[in-house]
């Protein structure tokens, strides 16, 4: 939630709910005709972000944006049209949308320190909090992630984006109770409107709870809905590895058909980890 959304809390409730739960179909169905100017601006940015997440074309993303703002420029830059660094330089000190989307851009490019610096400029911005939690967890700083979330709860209600951040803290922290808590959050969000994001969250918790068969079922459904959804593919790789020879051939075939695509960042990540493993193996064998 961007900082000046506080005054638009009721107007944007379902917009945020649908976006952060990955229920993009419901998001696109929202009637924007009676929205305030600022409410419309934020809703269009959420919708454009949803289109970007679904892999839609730049033209499709542009078509949803009727207002020219620093935020709309930032989402277009995130989609590959524009200079994000310039937008950050011009608006990063004051615009919450630019701070959030600029940080996402920097995270995608591996500039985690720059992203954290930008996020810390944001005032009462729930998504900025969630992104800081993500960076802390990526750096294995669980206590820092917990403290960041705790501080946010001093001034914010337990909005959906904070519930999701809490769930990922629980998954990284470990323990059966924490895994179950995370699973139930994703299961509740999945509800009657199943979507790839919540299905993948459930699957991740299932993997941690040593339930790879259940995880594969959720992941197959996620990929049926959104092919090339890399988070689902990553977790499917883990679930298949956990099952070993018992992994169903159908799941192996699904994974193989996607990972043969050279465009997937997942392949780059897997190749990077394979090279690291080979390096460590060589070092170990040389000292054994």
Swiss-Prot record:
Pfam families: Coatomer_E. Keywords: Cytoplasm, Cytoplasmic vesicle, ER-Golgi transport, Golgi apparatus, Membrane, Phosphoprotein, Protein transport, Transport. GO terms for molecular function: structural molecule activity. It is a peripheral membrane protein. Its main location: cytoplasm. The modification Phosphoserine is found at residue 262. It is found in: Cytoplasm; Golgi apparatus membrane; Cytoplasmic vesicle, COPI-coated vesicle membrane. One of its GO terms (biological process) is retrograde vesicle-mediated transport, Golgi to endoplasmic reticulum. GO terms for cellular component: COPI vesicle coat; cytoplasm; cytosol; Golgi membrane. The coatomer is a cytosolic protein complex that binds to dilysine motifs and reversibly associates with Golgi non-clathrin-coated vesicles, which further mediate biosynthetic protein transport from the ER, via the Golgi up to the trans Golgi network. The coatomer complex is required for budding from Golgi membranes, and is essential for the retrograde Golgi-to-ER transport of dilysine-tagged proteins. Belongs to the COPE family. Oligomeric complex that consists of at least the alpha, beta, beta', gamma, delta, epsilon and zeta subunits. This is Probable coatomer subunit epsilon. The gene is sec28.
